[in-house]
Amino acid sequence: MSTPPLAASGMAPGPFAGPQAQQAAREVNTASLCRIGQETVQDIVYRTMEIFQLLRNMQLPNGVTYHTGTYQDRLAKLQDHLRQLSILFRKLRLVYDKCNENCGGMDPIPVEQLIPYVEEDGSKDDRAGPPRFASEERREIAEVNKFQVNSKGTQPYLHMYPFSSKLPSHSGCRIPLSRIPCAVQNSNRRINS
């Protein structure tokens, strides 16, 4: 089996020869580095499981005659796994350092800012957001309750509190009136008066 001739022997250099190849090798995608790191972690877990399997199968020297060949074989496997494990940890550290180096210039963005809002009116006051949403939701529930009337036509059907619709009036209801939306209370007062 012969080796391929080098570029110095008269053949044109390949497309990845020279400074472009070195620059391409240096600029590795961070996502591919993370994938390599994930595979390295999986290899570490696999090697560690094999080490524990070897240790579990070893017998303690309790005065039992131990075959020298078996002992040497298991010891060699254990040392090989430990050596490979230390190499994998070094590789993982290099990948970790390279990922941190690539992401070093990026400012961490809070997770709350990554959530897209459907309706943004341009206001930057974060404290005004949740009460506005709650008041809109309350208004929608009040409109739905205002237009829903049960089969008798005398009381609004409270779909939020299904057990209260079986009662003849709100006087016997166990729900405090403060828990019922204002529009339902007002419509109930109009019906009862």
From Swiss-Prot:
Family: Belongs to the Mediator complex subunit 30 family.
GO CC annotations, alphabetized: mediator complex
PANTHER family in alphabetical order: MEDIATOR OF RNA POLYMERASE II TRANSCRIPTION SUBUNIT 30
Location(s) in or outside the cell: Nucleus
Assembly and interaction partners: Component of the Mediator complex, which is composed of MED1, MED4, MED6, MED7, MED8, MED9, MED10, MED11, MED12, MED13, MED13L, MED14, MED15, MED16, MED17, MED18, MED19, MED20, MED21, MED22, MED23, MED24, MED25, MED26, MED27, MED29, MED30, MED31, CCNC, CDK8 and CDC2L6/CDK11. The MED12, MED13, CCNC and CDK8 subunits form a distinct module termed the CDK8 module. Mediator containing the CDK8 module is less active than Mediator lacking this module in supporting transcriptional activation.
Any Pfam family the entry gives: Med30
The protein's name: Mediator of RNA polymerase II transcription subunit 30
UniProt record, GO biological process: positive regulation of DNA-templated transcription
Record-listed N-acetylserine modification sites: 2
Disulfide bonds: none
Domain of life from the UniProt record: Eukaryota
Residue numbers spanned by region Disordered: 1-20
Stored InterPro entries: Mediator_Med30_met
Compositionally biased region (Low complexity): 10-20
Species this protein is from: Bos taurus (Bovine)
GO molecular function, one term: transcription coregulator activity
Coiled coil ranges: 71-93
Entry function: Component of the Mediator complex, a coactivator involved in the regulated transcription of nearly all RNA polymerase II-dependent genes. Mediator functions as a bridge to convey information from gene-specific regulatory proteins to the basal RNA polymerase II transcription machinery. Mediator is recruited to promoters by direct interactions with regulatory proteins and serves as a scaffold for the assembly of a functional preinitiation complex with RNA polymerase II and the general transcription factors.
Keywords, comma-separated and alphabetical: Acetylation, Activator, Coiled coil, Nucleus, Transcription, Transcription regulation
